[in-house]
Amino acid sequence: MENIIHVNINPLITGFGNWAVSWHGFFSFVAVLFAVVLVGRWAEDYNLDQDIVYHVAVWGIIGGVIGARIVHVIDYWWFYQNQPLEMFMLWKGGIGVWGGVLGGFAGGVLCAHINKYPKYVLTDLAAPALMFGMVIGRIGDIINGEHCAKVYEGIFAMSWDHAASDVSNCKMKGAGIGIPVQPAIIYEMIWNMLSLYIIWYFRFKLYPSGMLWVLFLLLYSIGRLIISYLRYDKIWVPLNFFGMDISITEAQVIAIICILITLPILIIKVNFKNFSSFQFIENSSKTRAEKRRQNKNK
C-alpha cells in the first residue's frame, strides 16, 4: 500500500450556492490561455498575422467548449438525464477532450474557410499548442479525480481521499473515495508529453501543410485507445476476444475512426523535408510589432 499515490485536495477552489469553481475548470482555463498565447507567439514563424490567429482562436475556443461539453454529457447521460441543469454548469468541470479537439477544429476551420485564411497552416500552428494545453489540463483531472479508473493496488496506484472528490461518482464501478485505482490519468499525461515532443520534433519537417495536425490526431488517438482500457467508461461496443473483454468506449470509437483516417493520410501524403538550411522568417532585428506592420503593408 505504500506505493499508492494519495490525492487529498478539495476539487472545488471556491463555491457560492450552485456556483463553484473546480480545479478542473481552472486548469482548463489556464490550458486554453497558454495555447492561445503560444499560437500568437508562433504566428510569425508561419508568416501569419497575429490578428488572424486570434480571430481563428476565438472560433476554435467556442467550438471546443461546445463540443467538449456535448461529448461529456453524452458519455455521462446516465447522470445528466436526471439533473439536466447540470449540463450547463461548466464551472464545475466535466468535459470530453475529444469533443474539445474536434469541436475546436471545426470552429477554427470554419472561421478560416469563411475568411479565406490558410486553414491547413493554421492547424499545424495549433497542434503543438493544443497538446501542451492538454498536459496542463490534466493537472486539474488529477486533483479532481473525475475519471473512473479500474481498481488496482499495484505500483503507482492512485487514491482520491477527499470526501468531495469526483471519484465518488465511480462507486457503481467498484471505485470510490479511498479506493486505489489505475493511474490512468498519469499515463495519459505522460503520453501527451511524449506526443508533444514528437510533434515539436517534426515541426517544419512535414509537408504539405496540415500533416502536423494529422500527426497530432494520430498520436492522441493511439494513446486514448490504449489507456482507456484502464478506465471505466460507458461501453458503446461490447466485444469479447477469446474470453478477454475488449469492449470499446465512446472515446475509443472516436480514436479508432481517427486512426483509420489519419494513418493512411500520413502514409500516402506526408513528405519529409530537411529545413536545416531553410528559414521561414529571415533573421531580423525588428520587433514583433514592426514585423506585423510590415506584413500588413505587403
Language model region names:
Residues M1-K298:
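A feature for loop-to-transmembrane-helix boundaries and adjacent hydrophobic helices
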